[in-house]
Each structure stands twice: as C-alpha cells, then as structure tokens.
C-alpha cells in the first residue's frame, strides 16, 4: 500500500539519521506493519479506549505512548494503561494532551493538574503535549514550561521549518529556532526544581 511505502521510506530516512520513530497506530490491522518500522507506538486520544488495540499493542512489546482521551478522567486513563501492562508490556508512557472543556480560546484545555496527580498514582513516565493541548504555537512554550515545573518527564513538541505549508498541525508547530529556545529554557526549569 501507499502507507507501507511511505512508512518504509520515512523509516529508512530516519534510521540513516539515527532517529527513533514514534508513529500512531489507528487500527489493529495496521499494527504488524507499523511495528516493523516504528521504535515506539503511539495510541492517540481517539483510541485511548480502544481496548482491542490496547491489548494487541501490549502484546507487541514495543514501547507505547498512550495519549489521554479528550473526555477521559485520570482514573479511566490509568485503567486504559492497564490493558497494555496486563499483556506484559511495561514500556508504557502516559501523555497529557489536553481535554475537552467549555473554553473556546484554545482547541483543547491542557490539564496541568493531571501531571502531579498521575505522578502520585503511577510509576509510569508522564509526557506533556502542549501542542495538542492548546492548538496554537504561541502557547506551546508557556505550557511546556508549566508542564516541566509540574513534574512532566518529557515533552511531545511538533516542529516544522515551514509550518504554514505543513500537511497537518502547522498551526501548533514551532519553528526550529523557537523549539531550540524552548528546549534550553525547559532544561533550566527542570534543573532548578528538585522533585521528591
């Protein structure tokens, strides 16, 4: 298929650059193909409660980045992760990426509370996705800083040198220069905070 050709090409290109590949799995039927090329599987917000996909991804033993569903409580989110863990896959990271609220100024509302609450309830690493959490590039860095200060173990950031022509998510992508500044400031914040 065209997807397989694209993924094999992009996978080869990233391997040449010695970069790991994280890609989203949308359906159980695509799992074997994606596992051939990806270093980590992403299960997006819309599939957070796709239990068949969670079980099969758990069996794959590939690391999984599980994104929180837009209307998923934190307890429900942790129970979704249990489907992966129950299959013996201990390489699971949870990703806060914003929830649906009544607010319309941003695409989603980044739930900063989720980070310390999840850190208290689970041993799994917590990744923050401020790009999807806001939907606008100008809010990505401030929310990233807040997430690091709240205890996030990592960030998922979209970067594009020409976001205006990006095939998707251009409006929430940082240009490389802004990304580099954000990384440096995030390191300063992370190094200045001592977590228990």
Question: Across the structure, where does each feature detected by a protein language model lie?
Answer:
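Single conserved hydrophobic/aromatic residue that forms the stacking wall/gate
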Residues: 1-11, 16
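Hydrophobic faces of well-ordered beta-strands that scaffold small-molecule active sites
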Residues: 21-23, 41-43, 64, 92-96, ...
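Active-site beta-loop-alpha junctions enriched in small/polar residues
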Residues: 26-28, 46, 69-71, 97-101, ...
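C-terminal helical cap(s) of enzyme catalytic domains, especially alpha/beta-barrels
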Residues: 162-195
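Conserved anion-binding
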Residues: 46-113
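Charged helix-capping and loop-helix junction motifs
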Residues: 107-113, 138-145, 172-176
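Catalytic cores of alpha/beta
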Residues: 29-35, 76-80, 136-149
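Glycine-rich phosphate-binding active-site loops on the catalytic face of alpha/beta enzymes
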Residues: 45-49, 150-172
């Amino acid at each position: 298929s065209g997807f397989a050709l694209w993924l094999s090409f992009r996978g080869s290109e990233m391997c040449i650059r010695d970069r790991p590949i994280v890609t989203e799995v949308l359906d159980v039927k695509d799992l074997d193909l994606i596992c051939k090329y990806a270093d980590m599987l992403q299960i997006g917000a819309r599939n957070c409660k796709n239990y068949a996909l969670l079980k099969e991804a758990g069996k794959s033993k590939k690391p999984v980045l599980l994104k929180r569903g837009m209307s998923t409580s934190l307890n429900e989110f942790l129970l979704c992760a249990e489907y992966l863990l129950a299959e013996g896959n201990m390489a699971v990271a949870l990703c806060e990426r914003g929830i649906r609220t009544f607010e319309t100024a941003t695409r989603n509302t980044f739930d900063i509370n989720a980070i310390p609450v999840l850190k208290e309830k689970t041993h799994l690493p917590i990744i923050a996705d401020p790009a999807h959490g806001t939907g606008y590039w100008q809010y990505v860095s401030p929310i990233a800083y807040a997430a690091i200060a709240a205890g996030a173990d990592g960030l998922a950031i979209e970067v594009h040198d020409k976001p205006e022509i990006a095939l998707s998510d251009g409006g929430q992508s940082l240009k490389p220069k802004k990304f580099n500044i954000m990384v440096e400031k995030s390191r300063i914040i992370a190094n200045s905070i001592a977590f228990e």
